[in-house]
Amino acid sequence: MNRIDSRIKKVLDRGEKFLCCVLPLGDPDLKTSRKILEIFLQSGVDIVELMLPSQDPYFDSQPIAESNQRSLLAESNYQKYFETIVEIRNDYPDEPFEVMTYSDVVKNYGISRFVDGLREADVDAHLLADATAIAPDVVHDMDPLLEDAGIYRIRFMPHPFQEHLLDDIAHYARGFMILQSISDEAGNRMNVADGNREWINRVRATGTRASIMLGYGINNPARAKEAVNVNPDGMIVGTAVIERIASKDYRGLSELIRGIKDATIP
């Protein structure tokens, strides 16, 4: 069984929601990233998303974009990132890891070479953040390579909800899929709107084998409680943890993660 499936089943069987947090590799440097990963795991993170920096992470927040730039200034050689992921896997052979990046990184590194790097690091899943937006060519070439390597490609449902993605999610999504939470017209998320429940139910009604993870705007325990109330299987936290990494507030990082994880436990 894929480590992601095994971990999600274990968490859901306890009646909890699983928690995924984004680890920006290379921010502030690769050595420190490994120490931050230890904080993640000790504080209750169930699944770690290892983020490879992109020049244009346009689906993400300004703090995440700035984190990507700090990573690239610290280390621009992607081979070093893959070497670090191999070291991480050696340190944590049983932990589920998903690697996220954008198509510019994959294209520049080379699609086949990129998947080989994931395979050599024994990664469980990969999220191509802009897969459905601007990179169908990359998806076309990458999917069979990922399947051959036994690596899940994580699906992403953006807001506004896109009906045409449901068929792919129903038939091909594995592990988990990410649902971008509802925002207002200015893109703000002052809370986790109850309307997210409808979209979660729509995805679940497809019969997909992927667990549903809600993301964007979950930045503290109160928001996590709101997320629990709309009944996803799990949630992902990015900006809030990256802001604490940027300020080197590692105690606050651990407290944040523990608080959010506690909010997922009945």
Language-model segments: which ranges?
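Conserved, mostly hydrophobic/aromatic
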Residues: 21, 40, 51, 118, ...
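N-terminal small/glycine-rich loop or linker at the start of catalytic domains
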Residues: 6-28, 61-62, 67, 88-100, ...
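Short, electropositive alpha-helical surface patch
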Residues: 101-122, 228-239
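Hydrophobic faces of well-ordered beta-strands that scaffold small-molecule active sites
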Residues: 19-23, 48-50, 97-101, 126-128, ...
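Catalytic cores of alpha/beta
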Residues: 30-41, 112-113, 160-172, 218-235
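Glycine-rich phosphate-binding active-site loops on the catalytic face of alpha/beta enzymes
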Residues: 45-57, 121-135, 177-188, 230-250
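Histidine/lysine/aspartate-rich catalytic loop segments that bind and position anionic ligands
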Residues: 151-189
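Active-site-adjacent beta->alpha loops and helix N-cap segments on the catalytic face
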Residues: 1-11, 30, 54-66, 73-86, ...
